[in-house]
């Protein structure tokens, strides 16, 4: 984080519990799930409009855009392709690391309704043998849901791991119309369209398992 960053925080309700968004005027720093509740696995009514905690005058443009994006994600996903993605200003994206490349490719290419395997994402980031390093990149993701690490699954179709818990990953994929099954990337996206830009180490040599799933 730059010394010049003046941090702002916003909390909103969601079907997954309270979500805290932090960032500065230049972009988002983190999205965190707090007081996580067990998602209802069955069909649910659309959530109520987000309850925002904090003073509106403290909202920077990236925070405003992030709240609008998350609200649309949970309530009306069909409008997502027309929404701008908030800028991201986390230090991880200010380095030319493999992790940064992986997260950028995931954000740019794997859309709502698609899934991608660890091995596919490693190849998209320029190193097809670095599936295990992709797992590490997912654990380092500072802005989950926005950068959709929940869409990264095993090539066998197994769910794989998720920092937010498997119940949350399963709920997010079901919300996007994806149940158990092999990765759909490339193509097959539930929502088409171009998303407008959020993002203005050495990979591990260890392979993934035979089913294409990273072992953490």
From Swiss-Prot:
Family annotation (Pfam families): DNA_binding_1, Methyltransf_1N
Reaction it catalyzes: a 6-O-methyl-2'-deoxyguanosine in DNA + L-cysteinyl-[protein] = S-methyl-L-cysteinyl-[protein] + a 2'-deoxyguanosine in DNA; a 4-O-methyl-thymidine in DNA + L-cysteinyl-[protein] = a thymidine in DNA + S-methyl-L-cysteinyl-[protein]
Provide the cofactor list for this protein: Zn(2+)
PTM-bearing positions, type Phosphoserine: 14
A GO CC annotation recorded here is:
nucleoplasm
In which residues is Zn(2+) bound? 5, 24, 29, 89
GO biological process annotation, one example: methylation
| Keyword DNA damage (UniProt) | yes
Q: What is this protein called?
A: Methylated-DNA--protein-cysteine methyltransferase
Q: Give the organism, scientific name.
A: Canis lupus familiaris (Dog)
């Amino acid at each position: 984080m730059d010394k010049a960053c003046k941090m702002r925080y916003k909390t909103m309700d969601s079907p997954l519990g309270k979500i805290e968004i932090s960032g500065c005027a230049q972009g988002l720093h983190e999205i965190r799930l707090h007081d996580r509740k067990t998602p209802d696995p069955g069909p649910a009514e659309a959530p109520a409009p987000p309850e925002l905690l904090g003073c509106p005058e403290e909202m920077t443009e990236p925070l405003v855009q992030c709240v609008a994006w998350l609200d649309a994600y949970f309530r009306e996903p069909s409008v997502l392709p027309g929404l701008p993605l908030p800028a991201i200003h986390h230090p991880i994206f200010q380095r030319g690391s493999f992790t940064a490349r992986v997260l950028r490719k995931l954000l740019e290419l794997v859309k709502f309704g698609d899934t991608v395997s660890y091995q596919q994402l490693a190849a998209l980031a320029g190193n097809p043998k670095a599936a295990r390093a992709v797992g590490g990149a997912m654990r380092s993701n500072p802005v989950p849901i926005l950068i959709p690490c929940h869409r990264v699954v095993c090539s066998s179709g197994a769910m794989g791991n998720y920092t937010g818990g498997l119940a949350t990953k399963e709920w997010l994929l079901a919300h996007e119309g994806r149940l158990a099954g092999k990765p759909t990337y490339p193509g097959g996206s539930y929502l088409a369209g171009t998303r407008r830009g959020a993002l203005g180490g050495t990979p591990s040599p260890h392979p993934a398992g035979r089913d294409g799933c990273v072992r953490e």
